[in-house]
Amino acid sequence: MHENFDKRLEVLLEGLALTRRSLDPEGKENELKELEQQAVQDGFWDDVARAGKISERIARLKQQLSEFNELKNKVSTIQFFLEDEESSKDLEMQKELEKEFVFCEKKITEWETLRLLSGELDRNSCFLSINAGAGGTESCDWVEMVLRMYMRWASSHSWRVEVIDRLDGEVAGIKHITLKLVGEYAYGYAKAESGVHRLVRISPFDSNAKRHTSFASVEVFPEIDDKIEVEIRPGDIRIDTYRSSGAGGQHVNVTDSAVRITHFPTGIVVSCQNERSQIQNREACMNMLRARIYQKLLQERLEKQNIDRKNKKEISWGSQIRNYVFQPYTLVKDVRTGYEVGNIQAMMDGELLDAFIKAYLVDYGEIT
């Protein structure tokens, strides 16, 4: 047991050193001090949008530094007790050390994933859309299951989730839903989920208990700020208004507050019914449209670069990326990386999604 702990400690110390270099806690401390000084200046809240972003950055810096210091202290504690021969032989102490090792190893893995997120927009919040494929009620039910997985996963990262647009299925489930994941590195993580997700199971809607295959497509695009210029000419868009169809209080189905914008040159369509007024929904739609057009331009640029990497791996936008098999056996397998797990319930609870994302980033991080 002691030898096993010693080897694991070596790995932890190496991981901690790499984390320190990539995180740069001293640099983060200096940035935090500068931002906190700005936050107490007169007129700070005159620009609410800017003040909000600075406040979020301050909170994120504090969280990162707190987590790093906690990790550093736990590794030091482990090292101290392993150097004490009497303590390291105690069975109760070994149980406590095992708990500390598991915590530190998980945290190191999280930091390792962050090191893979170096894209220009990886740090941004993002929009995530889920659409039902062919299969009627089956696919709508599958969309709702995928939504639950992402909601739980986002919660584990402490991201705020906003429902931008939603269309329920005629019998059950959801035909379409767009979320906004608000938090640092939301896009960096979520971009790995773009593509078609395939479900195989015995249908709860089939009285003959036959196996059915259902599909849900996921599209992820980053939120972009006003510094990034995206040209949208008035003549290139059509703006439609309609009555909201989802939950939203007294305004639902009372006024034509929901907004849909169609961009003719790209064929992109965005809609929003989450806000309480037509003006707010229109603004939200324009922000999404800018983000999707910019994402499309980035994809086209990547496709033209003809990047050689490993076995000349390619990304096919909108292609099938993952299979979820419930019957006759349980298996979740990513067709891009080959990574797979058998615990499908933990996967659908959002607990194993980060492992799939890390495998994707290791293989494709440099070209997305």
Swiss-Prot record:
Its annotated compartments are:
Cytoplasm
Q: Which GO terms describe its molecular function?
A: translation release factor activity, codon specific
Q: Which UniProt keywords apply?
A: Cytoplasm, Methylation, Protein biosynthesis
Does the UniProt entry include the keyword Protein biosynthesis?
Answer: yes
Ranges in a coiled coil: none
Modification sites for N5-methylglutamine: 250
HAMAP family tied to this protein: Rel_fac_2
* NCBIfam families listed in its UniProt record: prfB (TIGR00020)
Family membership, please give it: Belongs to the prokaryotic/mitochondrial release factor family.
Q: What is this protein called?
A: Peptide chain release factor 2
| Species this chain originates from | Chlamydia trachomatis serovar L2b (strain UCH-1/proctitis)
Name of the gene encoding the protein in the UniProt record: prfB
